[in-house]
């Protein structure tokens, strides 16, 4: 599923953030992004690694335009709130969706995060 997000007709809009829930999805997406040079406009984050300072610093270095919150980098809801006004955000797993402030739109093989009105 994950590689389909980066090849062929793009599932993710230009400049998107893709937040992955598993190593399998993350490594496949990273391979297509970094090894094959596809979709260099897309930022790929692993939700499980956001708890580590070294990972957050690496993400800040690789994607300086991405809003990474200093006070709570693991707060996915705050990460979504900071980035959704400026970039489309997708999840590889709908179970990652925090709270009720957002809904999902299927964008196979991903799920686009949509703010509720």
Which residue stretches match the model-derived regions?
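ER/secretory pathway lumenal C-terminal domains and tails of membrane proteins involved
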Residues: 1-117
